[in-house]
Amino acid sequence: EIMPSLVGSEMCIRDSNDIAFKGKRSVEWSDVEKYLRQYVGDIYRIAETEDIIYIGTDLPDEYSGSNYTKHIKGTIAKAKANAVQAIPEMIEIATSKTFEDNKKNKHSRHAKNGWYRYDTRFALPVYDENGDVERYNVFSARLLIRHASSGKMYLYDVLEIKKETSKSCQE
């Protein structure tokens, strides 16, 4: 569900009944990778720019096994794992498109036309001891989009996930 936030921009809020990775002590990234495979072949549109974003076969592996993913822990790792359920909405509400040239030889074929980054936001429920939703934690993140030689833009990863302080929203 997409809702306006307390500060005026939109964010995606996950319903407490559909959190796939809740209550897990550590993230099983292979499960996240499997979950992401359902999106391969899907196409989404960013409302602000009307850019079309494709989901390619490289997303599940990159999202769950990137250097960024390997180095995150705790709340941020769980947030990234659960954000997979909100990918369509996170793409739709993305803002602040920026471009950067491809700098790595290993990406010269798949990101021949460089990279785009977009800001996005999502919120995840926090539960009390009874399993009821107590509040939502709000996160900001950057979508990393590769611009292929075909001219198509593909979601490659979600990076720079940060919990927004003092912006938790109440149910």
Question: What are the residue ranges of the model-derived segments?
Answer:
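Single conserved hydrophobic/aromatic residue that forms the stacking wall/gate
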Residues: 1-13
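Intrinsic-disorder/low-complexity loop/linker signature
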Residues: 50-51, 104, 130-131, 150-151
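A short, surface-exposed interaction/processing loop segment used at functional sites
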Residues: 27, 132-171
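Generic detector of low-complexity/intrinsically disordered segments
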Residues: 5-8, 126, 157, 161
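Acidic/negatively charged segments and metal-coordination signatures
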Residues: 17-26
